[in-house]
């Protein structure tokens, strides 16, 4: 089922729940609050699902804007959007990873076309790779090796090497914290 279909289904469910809530509230007595609480709880679940779908859709659009960038200016603008999403919290970083953002950033990092944007690409990766899902995706696409090679590349500019080292340090710190937590 596509996200539009799920969105419509959730919207219809919320409309029905609101109707049920109105009917129940008009008939409720203090001793019969359980049905009302059940409806409100289900409404909250629907609302959470709708918000998640809407956020996911917006994040997907932002990741797509990175992929479709035709110029360095467009790419820098799109990377700024992804970075701002990442700074909003871990949940949005997970959504960026879910929509292939980490994979895309690593692909662009290895492209000679986007060589002038390597620092920004690394900074964006560092922002997004603050959650386990993003780190796993980074490992799956061999991004760790790509970034490690940049750290050791004497031909790379110093700011790029510093950004690359920062991504690796953050990723290792998060991995160690996660493993010690488990």
Name each model feature, range by range:
Residues 1-182:
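Long amphipathic alpha-helical tracts in eukaryotic proteins
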């Amino acid at each position: 089922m596509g996200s539009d279909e799920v969105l419509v289904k959730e919207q219809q469910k919320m409309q029905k729940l609101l109707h049920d809530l109105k009917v129940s509230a008009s008939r409720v007595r203090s001793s019969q609050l359980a049905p009302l609480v059940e409806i409100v709880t289900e409404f909250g679940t629907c609302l959470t699902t709708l918000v998640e779908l809407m956020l996911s859709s917006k994040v997907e659009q932002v990741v797509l804007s990175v992929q479709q960038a035709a110029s360095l200016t467009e790419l820098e603008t799109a990377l700024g959007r992804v970075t701002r999403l990442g700074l909003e919290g871990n949940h949005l970083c997970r959504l960026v990873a879910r929509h292939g953002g980490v994979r895309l950033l690593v692909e662009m990092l290895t492209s000679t076309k986007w060589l002038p944007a390597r620092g920004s690409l690394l900074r964006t990766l560092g922002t997004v790779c603050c959650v386990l899902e993003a780190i796993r995706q980074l490992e799956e696409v061999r991004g760790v090796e790509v970034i490690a090679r940049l750290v050791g590349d004497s031909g790379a500019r110093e700011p790029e090497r510093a950004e690359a080292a920062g991504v690796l340090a953050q990723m290792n710190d998060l991995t160690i914290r996660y493993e010690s937590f488990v």
